[in-house]
């Protein structure tokens, strides 16, 4: 199916991936974008969401308390803040990573708001997905799995050595490989068995699932483009010449994408899990036109690119 954007930097370009069918069921996803390059992150997640077997409408948000340092005017014009959405409900929520995993949580300017987001999602979101730092922060705040800060960065593309259970998130996936770029780990030995999906004894958990709060936690970056790890490496080595190259990533000195198939299939499985949760609580999932008619907006007209 297709993705249509309610707001965001891509919205300025009337950006739509695929063919949007207004009579097909549509789910609403809140994407809390904590990454500094928000346009790139929008593109990365939008591409993955386009593989879901259902139409997706995305609302991009930033924390109200966060001091934005890049493209401030464009972000404030094209994003909503979390204060704008506390009264709303969403079918799904994705919270991205953030380059703050070397800071103490309490020093992050939106930490209190992030903790409120965790509590809010229990009553306002059907299914949640936390990536990299967001997973780290959620584990620390809610104490449902251990997190540990590292002095050296884990950087590269790694395959899970352990699949702990054949969860629906891993349907048609014999293994999991994804980019990792983090200064933290979730030690396998400290994680409750009910939460484990995929991981490694050395690198820690890759994927965790907590059915009690309808949440999935990914410690890496399925969404990364082929060049993202390379760009991070070039940024870091300009600051510290001793920065180690990302592992299992450069072949013949060129970045190689070996995770895309895993990423696309994982997001399809997550979308199907979300749809299953939604249909168990309601008889049907509304179409885009049904939602617009209920609001008195009439049928939708979309521009396809």
Curated annotation (Swiss-Prot):
Annotated compartments: Cytoplasm
Family per similarity comment: Belongs to the MetA family.
Reaction equations catalysed: L-homoserine + acetyl-CoA = O-acetyl-L-homoserine + CoA
Associated pathway: Amino-acid biosynthesis; L-methionine biosynthesis via de novo pathway; O-acetyl-L-homoserine from L-homoserine: step 1/1
Pfam families, per the entry: HTS
Site positions (Important for acyl-CoA specificity): 101
Species of the source: Leuconostoc mesenteroides subsp. mesenteroides (strain ATCC 8293 / DSM 20343 / BCRC 11652 / CCM 1803 / JCM 6124 / NCDO 523 / NBRC 100496 / NCIMB 8023 / NCTC 12954 / NRRL B-1118 / 37Y)
Coiled coil: none
Binding site for substrate: 153, 181, 235
Protein name: Homoserine O-acetyltransferase
Hydrolase in keyword set: no
HAMAP family found in the cross-reference section: MetA_acyltransf (MF_00295)
Membrane spanning stretches: none
Primary localisation category: cytoplasm
Active site: 132 (acyl-thioester intermediate), 221 (proton acceptor), 223
Source domain of life: Bacteria
EC annotation from Swiss-Prot or TrEMBL: 2.3.1.31
First-tier enzyme category under EC: transferase
Residues under site feature: Important for substrate specificity: 181
